[in-house]
Regions:
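Short glycine-rich, basic-tinged beta-strand/loop micro-motifs
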Residues: 47-66
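Long, contiguous N-terminal structural blocks used for assembly/anchoring
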Residues: 1-47
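Short, compact, well-ordered microdomains
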Residues: 66-96
Length: 96
């Protein structure tokens, strides 16, 4: 059963192991069912897999922004982490 965004935010807050970032990053990247469950909540269809692979810390903060439905904050977080939003598409790009 898919979780709501709020439930996902809570789950990641309670299960975060920021001392072992690589292990946690791998967990998020491999948890496609959970990531896929987020997609219906994203008004513009942003891809969270790219964000999770880029930086797990920003992914966690992004989940919190999603729970608050703060679109400008989401854009700021993604921009700060080197991810740019292609308006009118369902994908993210990465700055190289």
């Amino acid at each position: 059963m898919a979780m709501t965004v709020e439930e996902m935010v809570e789950w990641y807050k309670n299960n975060s192991d920021w001392s072992n970032k690589e292990k946690y990053k791998s967990k998020i990247a491999s948890d496609l069912e959970l990531l896929t469950a987020l997609n219906p909540f994203l008004e513009k269809g942003y891809s969270l897999i790219a964000a999770a692979e880029h930086d797990v810390v920003y992914f966690g903060v992004l989940l919190e922004a999603l729970a608050k439905a703060d679109d400008e904050l989401i854009k700021d977080i993604l921009s700060d982490s080197g991810v740019f939003i292609e308006e009118g598409t369902d994908s993210l790009g990465m700055f190289v």
